[in-house]
Every structure is written in structure tokens, then in C-alpha cells.
Curated annotation (Swiss-Prot):
Main location: cytoplasm
Gene name per UniProt: aroK
Cofactor: Mg(2+)
GO CC annotation: cytosol
Protein species of origin: Erwinia tasmaniensis (strain DSM 17950 / CFBP 7177 / CIP 109463 / NCPPB 4357 / Et1/99)
Name under which the protein is recorded: Shikimate kinase 1
Length: 173
């Protein structure tokens, strides 16, 4: 990879976007950003609070602006929020400004990885988490597929192994 292309990680919550993104950025000596963490840094509040106060629409507006700004940078790895792909503008920007890697995982792995995480506003509802994750997958998986340049299944692999797979795929392209 002679020139450093932006790498944008998309996929459902619990797929490993943040963990794998940090590993990937470290291995490639690139700057890492996480859109949810960037929202928290700028608002001084956690994502759950932003959701509670501004609703999902307010949160998505913030997310779209931050992703637009971050994708204008060069040589970054960006872990996006699972729902960021709901915005056509965001999908277009991700596709146009870098390589989009879809980190795919099963509902079972998502449940295992998110069960104790209270920072997931869409899971802090009365519906059973499995039903919520299945509904989100039905809505979002086609959008991830639509913009993915590369798709990698993360189920039983370490962040380092997945990062190496991404690097190998990028070197071939």
C-alpha cells in the first residue's frame, strides 16, 4: 500500500469496528477515529445521553456532520457507528473518500459482545436484544453490502488477525 488510503469500517454493533480499527491503524501507522467517541468528545456526554436528549434523529445529524468532516482527512482509519449507513449522504461520502470494509458478524456474537455494554442506546429498550439486533440487521445489512469494497467475517477471530486480513486484501487491490 504505497499511498495511505482512508479505511472506513462499517458493520453492526459488536462486530469489532473500534477494536479492529485501533489495531489496523496501529499496524499501518495511521490515525484512528471512532465516530461515536468523537461525538462524545465534542459534546462532553456519552452517546446514550445524546440519544436521550436529542433523539435518534439529533444523534444521526451529529454523526453525519462528524463523518463528513473526518472523511475529508487523508490516511485515517475510521470506525463508524452501526447506524451511520442509514444516511445516503454518509454512504456516498464513505464510498467516495476511501475503502469501505464491512465487518460482518452473527447475531449470536453481537449478543455475546454487547450483553454487558450499557452504552448501546438501541439495546436499552424493553424488546429482547435478539429481536432488536435482528430488526437492525434486516434494515442495515443491505446498506453495508451496498457500499462495501471488502467484507470480512469477524466472528471467532482476534482483532490482529482481522486487521492482517484487511491489510492483505488492500495490498492486493
Amino acid at each position: 500500500m504505497a499511498e495511505k488510503r482512508n479505511i472506513f469500517l462499517v458493520g453492526p454493533m459488536g462486530a469489532g469496528k473500534s477494536t479492529i480499527g485501533r489495531q489496523l491503524a496501529q499496524q499501518l501507522n495511521m490515525e484512528f477515529f471512532d465516530s461515536d467517541q468523537e461525538i462524545e468528545r465534542r459534546t462532553g456526554a456519552d452517546v446514550g445521553w445524546v440519544f436521550d436528549v436529542e433523539g435518534e434523529e439529533g444523534f444521526r445529524d451529529r454523526e453525519e456532520k462528524i463523518i463528513n468532516e473526518l472523511t475529508e482527512k487523508q490516511g485515517i482509519v475510521l470506525a463508524t457507528g452501526g447506524g451511520s449507513v442509514k444516511s445516503r449522504e454518509t454512504r456516498n461520502r464513505l464510498s467516495a473518500r476511501g475503502v469501505v470494509v464491512y465487518l460482518e458478524t452473527t447475531i449470536e456474537k453481537q449478543l455475546a459482545r454487547t450483553q454487558r455494554d450499557k452504552k448501546r442506546p438501541l439495546l436499552q429498550v424493553e424488546s429482547p436484544p435478539r429481536e432488536v439486533l435482528e430488526a437492525l440487521a434486516d434494515e442495515r445489512n443491505p446498506l453495508y453490502d451496498e457500499i462495501a469494497d471488502v467484507t470480512i467475517r469477524t466472528d471467532d477471530q482476534s482483532a490482529k488477525v482481522v486487521a492482517n486480513q484487511i491489510i492483505n486484501m488492500l495490498e492486493k487491490s
